[in-house]
Amino acid sequence: MANGTRQKDLRERAERVIPGGMYGHESTRLLPPEFPQFFRRALGARIWDADEQPYIDYMCAYGPNLLGYRQSEIEAAADAQRLLGDTMTGPSEIMVNLAEAFVGMVRHADWAMFCKNGSDATSTAMVLARAHTGRKTILCAKGAYHGASPWNTPHTAGILASDRVHVAYYTYNDAQSLSDAFKAHDGDIAAVFATPFRHEVFEDQALAQLEFARTARKCCDETGALLVVDDVRAGFRVARDCSWTHLGIEPDLSCWGKCFANGYPISALLGSNKARDAARDIFVTGSFWFSAVPMAAAIETLRIIRETPYLETLIASGAALRAGLEAQSQRHGLELKQTGPAQMPQIFFADDPDFRIGYAWAAACLKGGVYVHPYHNMFLSAAHTVDDVTETLEATDRAFSAVLRDFASLQPHPILMQLAGA
């Protein structure tokens, strides 16, 4: 059970030595109380919590698991490099190999820099854009998440107004709003940040409209600002290239993280020659940015991305899950809103403004051995098989029945209600 003996003990111990018992996106504070906080192991598309309760995992570690947990070829590549060395006095030659492989796969890229987390990559892109242009203003979509750094975090504790004084906002997918933002900050825009599609928590996802993407490219070309696609979350889950490739739009910079080393800690900033001099001139670094083991894992992950039908597998599994859920929702009379790419689904219920239905459904799915999320977009991996989807749909069908059975007594999450009233 999610609240088994080991889980309870770990939560109690964590409360004493970790602020809040857990922090950041890994905290289960906003999830249903049944959700486990601690996990013991993972393999393929499955995770086991601290009490060895198994789940088919549709969060994939919030994205990093692309090809399956502990994928054998990637683990072998990482193990081989680990025997040679990981964090050393200087980088391994494998860093050059990885840069060559990455640049060879991403059409707009002429060079690569590596770091650890998505926030590292986006903050480096911000600094680079200001160095390249000599300007201050960064344009971001309202509500967009580009990491946890002070200039962009959605939270306010410890953040000063001055941290964001040179960040301005536009409405995602609204070409006119973007054009107006350029006019309002004429002559001082260093970069426009855009996610490949709208993928914020507690919101329906929205695919990028061509007019919006073209306007972003046009405004940057006309003003000398840099176009930055933040592909940290979506990278390699919608394309084998930058996620705006299908729109025919190439950015100047793209930010990558999460899955290109299949869970090993590494992120990247890729750029065109236009921004090479600025990339050379800025100073960004980290003690573990040059670790060789994640780079070895990344090289093998990129090889699998190039050479296998992993993406087609992702899309097919996502489509099968989406179709099955839609059929179940109609049969049970509980309308779903499924948005975004099927392999990165966001699932909400219609007429559920305080998310009480979605939370109850997610908790019922968990009881049935399926880990879904009530407010964050989810992720499929190439390890999700047809049998996994079939087993998932059996559990989700039971979850629909449980929600209907308990419908009159469903209550919203108390912390969500506190936040809504704040």
Swiss-Prot record:
<protein>
    <recommendedName>
        <fullName>Aminopentol aminotransferase</fullName>
        <ecNumber>2.6.1.-</ecNumber>
    </recommendedName>
</protein>
<comment type="similarity">
    <text>Belongs to the class-III pyridoxal-phosphate-dependent aminotransferase family.</text>
</comment>
<comment type="function">
    <text>Involved in degradation of fumonisin B1. Catalyzes the deamination of aminopentol (HFB1) to 2-keto-HFB1. Pyruvate is the preferred cosubstrate, but it can also use several other alpha-keto acids as amino group acceptors.</text>
</comment>
<dbReference type="GO" id="GO:0030170">
    <property type="term" value="F:pyridoxal phosphate binding"/>
</dbReference>
<feature type="modified residue" description="N6-(pyridoxal phosphate)lysine">
    <location>
        <position position="258"/>
    </location>
</feature>
<dbReference type="InterPro" id="IPR049704">
    <property type="entry name" value="Aminotrans_3_PPA_site"/>
</dbReference>
<dbReference type="InterPro" id="IPR015422">
    <property type="entry name" value="PyrdxlP-dep_Trfase_small"/>
</dbReference>
<dbReference type="InterPro" id="IPR015424">
    <property type="entry name" value="PyrdxlP-dep_Trfase"/>
</dbReference>
<dbReference type="GO" id="GO:0008483">
    <property type="term" value="F:transaminase activity"/>
</dbReference>
<dbReference type="GO" id="GO:0005737">
    <property type="term" value="C:cytoplasm"/>
</dbReference>
<keyword id="KW-0963">Cytoplasm</keyword>
<dbReference type="InterPro" id="IPR015421">
    <property type="entry name" value="PyrdxlP-dep_Trfase_major"/>
</dbReference>
<dbReference type="InterPro" id="IPR005814">
    <property type="entry name" value="Aminotrans_3"/>
</dbReference>
<keyword id="KW-0663">Pyridoxal phosphate</keyword>
<keyword id="KW-0808">Transferase</keyword>
<dbReference type="Pfam" id="PF00202">
    <property type="entry name" value="Aminotran_3"/>
</dbReference>
